[in-house]
Amino acid sequence: TAGYEDEPSHTVTTVIVPHNAKSGQLVNYLAYIDSNGAQCAPSYSMRQGSKFLNDDLLNYQQLLFSTFLNEGWILTIPDYQGPQRAFAAGRLEGRMSLDGIRAALNFGEIGLEKNTSVVTYGYSGGAIASGWTAALQASYAPEINAIGFAMGGTPANVTSTVQSLDKGVFSGLCVAGITGIIYAYQVVQDWFQNHLYPKGNDAIEYARSHCITDIFSRYPFSHVFSDDFFRNGSSILYDPTIQSVISDIVLGLKESETPKAPVYMFHSQHDEIVPFSDARKTSHNWAKHGADVFFQEFSDLPIGHALSEITNIPNSLFFVRDRFAGKPFPKGYTRKVTGNGLEEPNASLAGLGELVRAIQDIQGREVGPADSELKQFILDRN
C-alpha cells in the first residue's frame, strides 16, 4: 500500500470465509480500533484467539461481525491504521482499506473474481476509515466494484471531535487521536518534538502500547489541550503546521472526493463522543456534490454513541443485503428520524428475533441508557 505522501508502505488484512460463503460478495469490515497499540489491530487480536479486538469495551462488535458471517458474506478486515498505527489519519486509513480489498480480490485461494461486489461498513473509528474509503475509492481504486458504503457515529471532523472530548470521561480518545496523527505525518511528529511536556510525552508513549479501554481508564476527565501536556496546549490545533494537516482530513469538503456508490449514514442526535452536526454536514456536502445519501438520525435520549450501533444492527444488515440484491436506493439526499434502530418495522422480521434479543441483552447489561454502563466501567478501572 502507500503512505500519505505516496511512499511505499504495507499492512495486513484478515480474510474470513464462512462455510456458507456466497460467491461474488465481499464485505470490507472496518473494526473500530480507536487506539495505537500494535496488539489492538484485528490481525493481532484475532490471531491470539482472543475476543474480537482483545478489548472488553469493544466485544459487542462480535455481534455484527457474526451476523455478517451468518449471511454467508466473505469478510476482509484490514489493519487500516497501518504500521504507524495511525488512528484518526483518515486519508491513510482509506488507502489501507482499499488496498486491503485489492489484496483480497487478488488472492487466488479465496476464489473472488476481480468484479466481485464490495460493500464497506465501519462505525465510530471504523467510520473514519469507511468514510475515507468512500471518498477515495473513485480516484485511488476505481477498478473496485464498490456498490455501497455504510458508516455510523462518523467522526467527520477530527478537530471538533477531539475538542468535544477534551476534559470529559472519554478524553483518552484525544490522546489516541493525537498520537495517531503524530505518527502518520512526519511534519507533525517533528513539530511535536518541540512542544511535548513530560506529561504529554508519557501520554503519547502510553497510547502507543495500549488499547482503547486502558487509554480510556488512564485519562478520563483529562485536559489534554493544556499546558500540562503540551507547550501552548490550548492553541495547538490552530497552529499553522497542525492546521495544514487536520484541515485536510475533514470528510466531504472536496467535490472530487464524492462517493460514487450509495451511502448509508446513521448517527444519534445525542451522541456524547462524536459530534452529530459534523456527520450531518458531511452527508449534506456529499449529496450536494452528487452522491446518493440516506442519513438516519436517532432521537431517543438514551441512545448514545455505543447504543447507536448496537440497536441499528438490523438496519445495517438490511443495507448490505439490499446492495448485494441490487435493490433500488433513494436518489439524492434522504433524511429519516427514528427513536432508535430497533423501531424500524423490519427489525421484527422472522429470523431476526434471536438477533434482536441479543441486542436488547447487550443494551441493558453492558451499555446502559446513554452509555451509562460503559462510562461506569471506565471509571471503575481508573
UniProtKB/Swiss-Prot annotation:
Glycosylation positions in this chain: N115, N157, N232, N346
EC number(s) given by UniProt: 3.1.1.-, 3.1.1.3
InterPro entries for the chain: AB_hydrolase_fold, Lipase_secreted
Biological process annotations from GO: lipid catabolic process
Induction: Constitutively expressed regardless of pH conditions or exposure time.
Enzyme class: hydrolase
GO cellular component: extracellular region
Keywords, ordered alphabetically: Disulfide bond, Glycoprotein, Hydrolase, Lipid degradation, Lipid metabolism, Secreted, Virulence
GO molecular function per UniProt: triacylglycerol lipase activity
Source organism, top-level taxon: Eukaryota
Reactions catalysed, as given in the entry: a triacylglycerol + H2O = a diacylglycerol + a fatty acid + H(+); a monoacylglycerol + H2O = glycerol + a fatty acid + H(+); a diacylglycerol + H2O = a monoacylglycerol + a fatty acid + H(+)
Record's protein name: Secreted triacylglycerol lipase LIP5
List of catalytic residues: S124 (nucleophile), D271, H305
Record family assignment: Belongs to the AB hydrolase superfamily. Lipase family. Class Lip subfamily.
Bridged cysteine pairs (disulfide): C40-C211
Function per UniProt: Secreted lipase that hydrolyzes acylglycerol lipids such as triacylglycerols and consequently releases free fatty acid. Can hydrolyze 4-nitrophenyl palmitate to release 4-nitrophenol and palmitoic acid. Due to an absence of fatty acid synthase genes in Malassezia species, secretory lipases are essential for the yeast to generate free fatty acids from degradation of sebum and assimilate them as lipid sources for growth. Plays important roles not only in lipid metabolism but also in the immune response of host cells and pathogenesis.
Protein's cellular compartments: Secreted
